[in-house]
Amino acid sequence: MSNVKLRIENIVASVDLFTQLNLERVIEMCPHSKYNPEEFPGIICRFDEPKVALLIFSSGKLVVTGAKSVEDIERAVNKLIQMLKKIGAKFSRAPQIDIQNMVFSGDIGMEFNLDAVALSLPNCEYEPEQFPGVIYRVKEPRAVILLFSSGKIVCSGAKSEHDAWEAVRKLLRELEKYDLIGEGEEEEW
């Protein structure tokens, strides 16, 4: 179990640029973008480097998604700010970036009988006709972990890598408590 790693699959952040934006001007500066105000009130902009998508609103608020690191989000926001400065946008202060959701994947390294897991663990759901994994909810830190019979996991809802690890540790402690994994294995994490 000591070789278990969590890999970031996606980070979603909300950003406030603290400025109003003229989206008709912004769309001219953003390659790989789409703006149809009758369908959606913002610009959908894609960057190749870093590889992210941005939703840009006239309020100066953004949603950045698809990032694999917090640094990617910061780089994308700074890249957009440099583009916006070219069309005369003024910024009263540094952007505020708030991580909304981080999604991680990982592998516990052993197979599970999901029926036994669902019958033993509190705070979980298992409807194999609807979804092939156990949905385990962690209250603090708030996160949802999907556990599959292969031992693969997906952790979503965490606001940081630390929170994701803490949520996974809680799942492992519960699995150990109900004798669903061997004792002591979780300690190697």
Curated annotation (Swiss-Prot):
InterPro entries: TBP (IPR000814), TBP_archaea (IPR033711), TBP_CS (IPR030491), TBP_dom_sf (IPR012295). It comes from the Archaea. Pfam families: TBP (PF00352). GO terms for molecular function: DNA binding; DNA-binding transcription factor activity. Keywords: DNA-binding, Repeat, Transcription, Transcription regulation. Sequence repeats lie at residues 8-84, 99-175. The keyword Amino-acid biosynthesis does not apply. Belongs to the TBP family. PANTHER family: TATA-BOX BINDING PROTEIN (PTHR10126). General factor that plays a role in the activation of archaeal genes transcribed by RNA polymerase. Binds specifically to the TATA box promoter element which lies close to the position of transcription initiation. This is TATA-box-binding protein. It comes from Thermococcus celer.
